Amino acid sequence: MAFTSAVITFPGSNCDRDMAVAIEQVCGGTVHRVWHGDADLPEGLDFIALPGGFSYGDYLRSGAMAARSPVMQAVVRAAERGVTVLGVCNGFQVLTEAGLLPGALMRNAGIRFVCRDVKLTVENNQSLFTAGYDAGQQITIPVAHHDGNYFADDATLDRIEGEGRVAFRYAEEVNGSARNIAGVLNDRGNVLGMMPHPERMIEAAHGGSDGRALFESVVRGLVEA
């Protein structure tokens, strides 16, 4: 079975090529490049990725306008059918604005853009995205964001913690995120949003390969299982 994926590009996306290259190199198969104005997605998709960037210039709120793009209606329908969806950085913001993930991403504490490698702890390795890691494993993945401060009310935080839906946690305070949450799963486990950029860490020659296992986990879970 060939792996078929799509990378969504919004006006202002700037990590869409990086995401497509990572998927091509690690997962193989066919990677479709899909424009925000497309009302439909290609048939037979296994995986959809929403990349980082500054969609629509982050006007109104980060991800708010992109979440109302024609293509996002198709992405929401696909996610509800069980298609695997990954949102990274701005993609995470879009997923929360579209209602596919709980919480919101706010301006970083300190009102500063954060761009550096950070340590993450793998909180849940039982998901499709994280099965290639060990529970409690520390990995190094870069961040680059101004609005990555994850917020949810206490009841929501308690619920997602109790349901094992925190996929990744910052090993130390990075941007003010509630409980240092860096990545969150939906209740079905087929949608992951995370602020750090795993697609930038797939080759040791480029500074590290800790992000590679995420893509390997996805293709193994969807194709090789």
Curated annotation (Swiss-Prot):
Pathway per the UniProt entry: Purine metabolism; IMP biosynthesis via de novo pathway; 5-amino-1-(5-phospho-D-ribosyl)imidazole from N(2)-formyl-N(1)-(5-phospho-D-ribosyl)glycinamide: step 1/2
EC code(s) of this entry: 6.3.5.3, 3.5.1.2
BP GO annotations: 'de novo' IMP biosynthetic process
Location of the protein in the cell: Cytoplasm
Keywords: ATP-binding, Cytoplasm, Glutamine amidotransferase, Hydrolase, Ligase, Nucleotide-binding, Purine biosynthesis
SUPFAM superfamilies: Class I glutamine amidotransferase-like (SSF52317)
Enzyme active site: C89, H197, E199
Positions of the Glutamine amidotransferase type-1 domain: 5-225
One MF term in the entry's GO annotations: ATP binding
A cellular component annotation (GO) from this entry: cytoplasm
Catalyzed reactions per annotation: N(2)-formyl-N(1)-(5-phospho-beta-D-ribosyl)glycinamide + L-glutamine + ATP + H2O = 2-formamido-N(1)-(5-O-phospho-beta-D-ribosyl)acetamidine + L-glutamate + ADP + phosphate + H(+); L-glutamine + H2O = L-glutamate + NH4(+)
Primary role: Part of the phosphoribosylformylglycinamidine synthase complex involved in the purines biosynthetic pathway. Catalyzes the ATP-dependent conversion of formylglycinamide ribonucleotide (FGAR) and glutamine to yield formylglycinamidine ribonucleotide (FGAM) and glutamate. The FGAM synthase complex is composed of three subunits. PurQ produces an ammonia molecule by converting glutamine to glutamate. PurL transfers the ammonia molecule to FGAR to form FGAM in an ATP-dependent manner.
Subunit and partners: Part of the FGAM synthase complex composed of 1 PurL, 1 PurQ and 2 PurS subunits.
Stated name of the protein: Phosphoribosylformylglycinamidine synthase subunit PurQ
